[in-house]
Amino acid sequence: MSFLAIDIGNTRLKWGLYDAAKPGARLLAHGAVFLETIEQLAEQDWARLPHPTAMLGCAVAGDAVRRRTEEQLELWDLTPHWVVSQPVGGGIVNGYDHPSRLGSDRWVAMVGARERILEQTGPGARPVPAIVVMVGTAVTVDAVDPDGCFIGGLILPGFGLMLKALEMGTAGLRVPTGDVCEFPTNTSDALMSGGACGIAGAIERMHRQLQQRCGVAPRILMSGGAATKLAQIMALPVEVVDTLVFDGLLRLASDRVAAGLA
């Protein structure tokens, strides 16, 4: 039994094929395409893959993109299943005012982070709290307490959106290809460093608040296209986990199988 995990963000679709629908399953193949080229999946990326027997995905790019993806899944006559955030599930208690309105990618990433923390917690020890950071078109910074309760989070513009906003709202500034540095001495570096420091500051503030609330230092788990770049400038220890969303989908898929829903 092979399992297909799909993560549709605002810019790209990422997929992973696993040998089973359970945590710790072996990754057989993976890839990513821009949303504009989804129609090529069945003829290119997926053409030579083994036939998956189940799939689960999360999608934040809207119904139209999800339907386009489902058309590609017809290659295998595969019934699509998409995550909707729940009040409780995957080891996470959803503290959002309206739980179903929490972005499914955020919820799935928290499930993946919680699974990772529980695996690394010794017998009889209490899990540590976590800051779950997704660095993409937007940046999300979510707090999970030691009991697995999501207690709140932040949404910020990502690097690209910050730079575009400055380009549109100011005279004489163009989107740069600058570097992140401590003391920028040119406009390109100043813009890139300003965006990076703004995101890093939000994460560090959330870390401080969660530590004050829980009485123990949280772990920061970070994923997304620019995660490695951002982690390098953080003043706090950061674990970059590229598969955080896929790990969450594996846990949720396993729960579906156990409940007889798959």
Swiss-Prot record:
One Gene Ontology term, aspect cellular component: cytoplasm
GO BP terms: coenzyme A biosynthetic process
Binding residues annotated for substrate, in chain numbering: Y96, G103, S104, D105, R106, T187
Cofactor: NH4(+); K(+)
Domain of life of the source: Bacteria
Compartments, record wording: Cytoplasm
Keywords noted in UniProt: ATP-binding, Coenzyme A biosynthesis, Cytoplasm, Kinase, Nucleotide-binding, Potassium, Transferase
Functional description taken from the UniProt entry: Catalyzes the phosphorylation of pantothenate (Pan), the first step in CoA biosynthesis.
Name the UniProt record assigns to this protein: Type III pantothenate kinase
Name of the gene this protein is made from: coaX
